[in-house]
Amino acid sequence: MDTNAILKRADELFDDDRAQEAGAYLEKMAEQAVSEERYGTAMSLFNELTGYYRNTGNLDAAWRCVDEIVRLLDLLDLWGTADAATAMLNIATVYKAAGDPAAALAIYKKCEPVFISENVGDRRLAGLYNNICVTALETGRRDDALYYAEKAWRIAERVHMDGESLELVRKNYNAAKQAAVNV
């Protein structure tokens, strides 16, 4: 069972506007991975499914995936790793989609030291900081929002981000600066 091949096939289905088919395919392959005890693959697929279900508004299915991810993190004893922090970042987005940005913010902040110690790379760290900034704004934590927006912006400048990623960081940085001024 090749995780990359499965994800590539799912991406092709998504690209062909066959999202429902892609979701069903990922679900089938995740269940097969569990039954074959290919837990690393299963965790990757449940992470993908979490995003799929969150984006389609099926939060019940997203929470089911969250439960499975946590079970797999326990089973594989992955807590404190970059894989676990990435999974927790996905879980935080489900909390946010479910209307609990404070819980999401707490989870995002727990990811930061792991991402730093595991040296996940600047772009992923900038993405985390961007998520923290946006969620801090949503919860009225203007100082946190500006602090993390500045961290994301410094990374974006250092690694010469461009395109949509840079625009997103810039937009959120400006929103955080504006919110800090309007205290």
Predicted segments — roles?
Residues 27-32, 70-75, 109-117, 151-158:
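Amphipathic alpha-helical segments of tetratricopeptide repeats
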Residues 4, 43-44, 83-86, 126-127, ...:
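Residue register of alpha-helical TPR repeats
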Residues 1, 40-41, 61, 80-83, ...:
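Structural signature of alpha-solenoid helical repeat junctions
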Residues 35-38, 75-79, 117-121, 158-162:
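Short coil/turn linkers that connect adjacent helices within long alpha-helical scaffolds
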